Amino acid sequence: MGKKLRTYYAKSANSFHGAITNREHLDKVATLARRFGAEIGKEKAAGVAGGVHDFGKYADRFQGVLSGTHQGVDHALPSAAELYRLLDLRTTQRVWADGICAVEAVAGHHDGLIGMPQMQDGLEEMLSSDDWDDCPSGKMPSLHGQEEFMQAEEAFARDFPDFHMQRIQGKRSRVQGRLEDMLDTRMLFSCLVAADYCVSASDDDPAYLEKNSRPPLDAEAMLKKLEVHCAHLRKTSTADVSVNALRNEVYARCGEAGEQP
């Protein structure tokens, strides 16, 4: 008889459900993230982020977390490293700007956002070094080194035999500190984290999304409320003048973008 293939899990069983496979979780999060991303014109990037955000759970150390034999394991950063590899961001001169945003969103979906310049060297070392353990979270990476990543890639391929990396918008140079890229990262991050949370909550309560959905947005009414709120903040803010100037610029840029088709 052939060797039995291992099943990798994303969540252990509780009083609401049995153990949930990583395949099921990734598929559901990718689907919901695409739905959220479509609302901001980032359907593909959000779907890609959702589809690999827990790649790092294809790992003995993370499976040990579920069984109680391990703790302090970071699966998010190895997931980001795999997406970084899939997008070939280490070799391209003019990178997929949305790809970088997706990597940043995946890396931060549990412990907070980190910019690509701050983590790129670590991602590359994690992919190649069996000894790398310098996660910003202070935890042990669920995967490190070529052998562990290769085993995880084989398990992922068994779960998703038709997977292929989608083209994520057109190539353009990414300028350090550009507001548009910063906002793109945060919007993708929001899509991913919301999808991840909603899927997990729906595992416990299948009616979660229906219960927590809101009526269609009345954009004009909400914009008026936002303008009143922001006007009050400008009058009463005690923050540094330069910080407020940056906030006003972000607000103005968002307004300008909102006027575009």
Regions found by a protein language model. Give the residues of each.
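Accessory nucleic-acid engagement/destabilization modules that flank
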Residues: 2-17, 22-233
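N-terminal pre-P-loop "Q-motif" helix
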Residues: 22-25, 240-261
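Short glycine/proline- and acidic residue-enriched helix-loop micro-motifs
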Residues: 236-237
